[in-house]
Amino acid sequence: MTTNTVSRKVAWLRVVTLAIAAFIFNTTEFVPVGLLSDIAQSFQMETAQVGIMLTIYAWVVALMSLPFMLLTSQMERRKLLIGLFVLFIASHVLSFLAWNFNVLVISRIGIAFAHAIFWSITASLAIRLAPAGKRAQALSLLATGTALAMVLGLPIGRIVGQYFGWRTTFFAIGLGALITLLCLIKLLPKLPSEHSGSLKSLPLLFRRPALMSIYLLTVVVVTAHYTAYSYIEPFVQVVAGFSANFATVLLLILGGAGIIGSVLFGKLGNKHASLLVSSAIGLLLACLLLLMPAAQSETHLAILSIFWGVAIMIIGLGMQVKVLALAPDATDVAMSLFSGIFNIGIGAGALVGNQISLHLSMSAIGYLGAIPALAALIWSILIFRKWPVALEEQPHHG
C-alpha cells in the first residue's frame, strides 16, 4: 500500500479525476447507441449494419481485458494510464476524421484496447488513492462515474451529434479525455504495480460454482437487454415513427431512471440483493415484451423506459456486488472477468439485434430479447435458492 501522505483534498481530487475518466470511457462505449442513424446516413449504410460496430467494440474489450491485465501487471500505473489515454485520444481523432466505415471501426478498436486496460486497473487504483478508511466511497464514486455515462453521457453525446454531427461527439470525447489526462499527470504520484492478482487466481475463481453461475447470469441478462437497447434509437424513429428529438428524450429517461435504480439498490441492496436482482430481471422481461405494444404512444414508451432504466441499473449493481462478495481475495481478476463477460453480453445482444433487424424486422427486437430475459429470470431464481446466504453482500472492511 502506498502510504497516503497527501492531504485528504488531493486524495479525493485523484479519485474524482479517476471517476471522470470512468465517465468518459463508458460514454464512448455507449454513445454510438444514440448515433446509429446519423452514422448510417453519412456512410449510406443501413442502420442495422452500423450496429455491428457496437459488437466489435464490446468483444474486443471482452477478449483483451484479461490478456492486457496480465501483460501490463508489472508496469508502473501512472505511465500506463498516460499511455492508454494517449491511445484513447488519438483513436478519437481518427473517429472524427473517419473517411469510411472501416476506418471508423479501426478507430473504435483502438479505443476498445485502451478501454480494456483502463477497466482492469481503475478499481484497484481508486482504492489505493482513496483517503484512509474511505475505500468503499472511492469505489462508489467510480461506479457513479460509470453510471452517469448511461444517464448523461449517452444522451448528451446524442444531442451534440444531432446538432453538430456525430464526428463532433467523438471529437468532444477526445477533448474531454485530453483535459482529464492533463489533470491525471498533475495529480497522480508514481504508482508502482501491486499484487493485482495473477493467472494463479483464475483456476481458483473457476472452481467457485456460485461465482460462475453469476457470470453466466450476467452474460444472458446483458444479452437480453442489449438486443433491444442497441437499436432503441432507430426503433423509436423507424418502427414507432416518432421524432429524432423524442428518441433523445427517451434515452435521457432511460438513463435518468438508472439513478432511481441505484438509490433503490443503495437502500435495499445489502439485505435483499438476491430478491432485488430477480425482481429487476422480471421487470426487464416485462419491459421487453411490452416494447412493441408500447410503441403506439410516446407516453407509453416513456413510462416503459422508466421501469427499464431502473431494472437494468439494479441488475448491473447487483451483479457487481455479488462478484465482489464471492471473490474478495482476487478482486482485480474477478472484476476484469466481470467486465469481459459483461461486454460479451453487450456484443452478443447488439449482434442479435443486428440480425433481427436485417433478416426479420426491427419491430421484433423486444420479443426476441425477452427469450434470454426469461432464461435469466429462471436461472436467477434457481441459483439464488441454491446459494442463498453466501451471495448477499458481506460487510466490507474498507
Curated annotation (Swiss-Prot):
Listed InterPro entries: MFS (IPR011701), MFS_dom (IPR020846), MFS_Efflux_Transporters (IPR050189), MFS_trans_sf (IPR036259), Sugar_effux_transptr_put (IPR023495)
Entry keyword Cell membrane: yes
Keyword DNA damage appears in the UniProt entry: no
Keyword set, alphabetical order: Cell inner membrane, Cell membrane, Membrane, Sugar transport, Transmembrane, Transmembrane helix, Transport
Gene3D superfamilies (alphabetical): MFS general substrate transporter like domains
Gene Ontology cellular-component terms listed: plasma membrane
TM spans (from-to): 15-35, 50-70, 81-101, 103-123, 136-156, 169-189, 209-229, 246-266, 275-295, 301-321, 333-353, 364-384
Compartments (UniProt record): Cell inner membrane
Gene Ontology MF term list: carbohydrate transmembrane transporter activity
CDD domains: MFS_NepI_like (cd17324)
Membrane topology: Multi-pass membrane protein
The protein's role, per its UniProt record: Involved in the efflux of sugars. The physiological role may be the reduction of the intracellular concentration of toxic sugars or sugar metabolites.
Family affiliation: Belongs to the major facilitator superfamily. SotB (TC 2.A.1.2) family.
Protein name according to UniProt: Probable sugar efflux transporter
Native organism: Enterobacter sp. (strain 638)
Gene: sotB
